[in-house]
Amino acid sequence: MPRRQILSSEEQERLLVIPDDEIILTRMCFLNEPDIALINKHRRPANRLGFAVLLCYLRGPGFIPDKSSAPHNGVVSRVASRLKLQPDLWPEYASREQTRWEHLTELYRYLYLELSPFSRSMQKDCIRHLHPYAMRTDKGFMLAEEMLSWLHNNNVIFPSVEVIERTLAEVVTLANRSVFSTLTAQLEKQHKSALDSLLISEGEQPSRLAWLLQPPGKINGKNVLQHIDRLNSIAALGLPDGIALSVHQNRLLKLAREGRKMSSRDLAKFTDVRRYATLVCIITEARATLTDEVIDLHERILGSLFSRAKRTQAERLQQTGKLIQSKLKQYVTVGQALLNARESGEDPWTAIEDVLPWQEFINSVEETRFLSRKGNFDALHLITEKYSTLRKYAPRMLSALQFMATPAAQALSDALDTITEMYRKQLRKVPPSAPTGFIPESWRKLVLTPSGIDRKYYEFCVLNELKGALRSGDIWVKGSRRYKNFDDYLIPTAEFEKSRHNDQLQLAVQTDSQAYLQARMTLLASRLEEVNAMALAGDLPDVDISDKGVKITPLENSVPSGVSPFADLVYGMLPHPKITEILEEVDSWTGFTRHFAHLKNNNVRPKDGRLLLTTILADGINLGLTKMAESCPGATRSSLEGIQTWYIRDETYSAALAELVNAQKERPLAAFWGDGTTSSSDGQNFRVGSHGRYAGQVNLKYGQEPGVQIYTHISDQYSPFYAKVISRVRDSTHVLDGLLYHESDLEITEHYTDTAGFTEHVFALMHLLGFAFAPRIRDLHDKRLFIHGKAERYPGLQSVISTTCLNIKDIESHWDEVLRLATSIKQGTVTASLMMKKLASYPKQNGLAKALREIGRIERTLFMLDWFRDPGLRRRVQAGLNKGEARNALARAVFLHRLGEIRDRGLENQSYRASGLTLLTAAITLWNTVYIERAIESLKRKGIPINEQLVSHLSPLGWEHINLSGDYVWRNNLKLGSGKYRSLRTVDTALYKKQS
């Protein structure tokens, strides 16, 4: 059996590379006097050069250049200059293998006090050092880098790549065995028997394991109960508590993901220890997923009940509208009759009966009393009409999940215990001693009645408040992934303090609160004085601040009139390819498909690259695997499913996207659009259809219909570098994710969003993490500046200064918590979006949320002052957001099949759709950029003058020339050779000359 390959050929080439760094090269090529004396003992100039180069390699990075390739040019030239020799002597030296080995033997003797050879005993020491790292990851390149670092620190000469690979293979094999044995060490015979029973299927029925891993399906109580059954089945296995905590999370997730992709039959073929270890990981992850999905189902059911109550209330109000109007007219008539009777001294009762018979008046009062019920005007009164829906699953849900609370939510936790006990004892009434301190004012009159606590409203209130407490982290659930204790998400306090003491927090602010606040307050005061003076003098460009507030004149269109004919000319020259041809051509330039590695072995790639491209295309154009197999000759559904199962993952899509973004960054034309340091982000809503309606969620920004929102980040060079399927939460929750977790070489420093992308918490964390944040705020005229001091000091701005002052004490009191949170996000301990959700759900009195709000107010005030005084900032933001909107239009055009609806039920498949779409738009953007460059060069050769200002206004997001639909055929006869491009189309340049 061949040894497993740990490093790909590309990684092997990257492993022993000298960087193009002047300081490193200069330090590496330093030769002392004894070195020079030894070198000069060799008579031939070529031998002196070669000997010196080998010496520099051994003493510097610790390895010798491969005999089949030349050493770094910078090393050869520097050494040659030091020895006063010609650098072109190296080929002469390299041709003499015997001389090379003699020199190496001599160098090993010369350096024996400085360097040690890589012996078998040294290899064993290296393996012992690498073993803890291999217990965390089996990624070969990361282990190889750690191995070389250890060898370098211990002054060991690097062995060949083949020896490095063998060493790593041994380390990974030992670590795998350790992981398996650690996961199974606590398993008794009954545990193993129970795990094996999960793989058994009876007849046509799926195995028990397949049943455990099924997605939730429709949003209803029945599916909540089925998920609870699954949780109870996992609990019945009786696996030891914390069995999976003994291995690193990376290993756990990888084993679980591999196992989920395999059939029960294939899992049964594993060796015993590997099978049980894999099943333990699958079950551990399944338990966390099921727990989170039960809570999510409950929240969405609760949300649908409240929405239904609102609709019912609106419908009833509409139905009774005419009756209410008639009653109003009736009482106006009665009232006028009473007024007239008072003035004339007539009997009021007779006056009423003159306009309305007395019995009709009595009936009218009763009807009006019915119409004036609060249920007709407040939807909360109608919520208990669907109490049976909640009652169907709530008892079992509360029994199956283990809730724990912070002191702030203890009353709510006690209320949950009360309800659970009522269900268990089948009590009909809520005990008078039940906790009520958590009940919001809007619920109190419904829950607390003269006859006691209303049970239905009490249960609804408790479960509704539970939703908010879970989101904020005040209540958490044992075994959950998304609803853990807030402190568990952050780096440990001791580790944070150590990093802070060593100045390793990697934040963009001073860690001393007093120094930080003094600097920000000084800057804020300076900026306020500057803008105040400009406002008083009327010097704010296109901004008028008066007693009525702020008025900003909209930006004028800055696009030159010549852009349109120039763009028509250039796009008219572009070839008319099929989307399949674009993907193949872009892959030939970038090799992005090499990033789609096998789940089990990172060095295995699909044998048929076109099947991989077909699978990506099925995601990107929203065709799906079944229809794609029908539309693509040579592809079958099973072959495409195999590719999707083993090669399509979020991380492979992300790495491939980064490859395209980096390629776009290197294009000369991209520099006309930006330098890759600014970006924008925006959400795009896609309707859901068929089964997807169960997975779609309502985001009020896009209306009342459920949908799937894809949140995309795009650079100033038009390349989309991050995309994520988001839920019904505000866009601002996910702004930081794209800036922190993209894998491209972009170095974003300034980011733009629309109104939905900002909150004060976002302003705060953006600043702490080193990003300039510039949202286009729609209702900016309603926003206020926050200052520390009296508004009278700035008369020109007084009308827009808030009456609430900055609370500096909140920042000072919780500064350590703020830094710990920001550091946790920066280091990747927790995602920014998860923390943003928690912070948004925190009660207003929470100290950390208040401190971040105050920091955000400082940063938003500074931003607003910049917005007032700098029209260039306004133009940059507008241009950045326009690029995002144009990219969304391209995405809408590409995502053309199934009426542009997402019909996938699972979040994983929806994520693949989003990633495939983003990769496709990035490929089109790069392809357009390359051919626009070629078109411009062609025009230059024809003598057409090119205005660079017009070039900067071209966009690579056009798609009219691309054939996106039809049969998806991969043609061999149209495949381009290396360095070849498609012919440009012929256009009439005379007409353009005349127009321009």
Where are these regions (language model features)?
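Short, charged amphipathic recognition helices of the HTH superfamily
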Residues: 50-51, 69-73, 620-631, 637
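Short, conserved catalytic/metal-binding motifs centered on acidic residues
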Residues: 62, 628, 679-685, 751-756
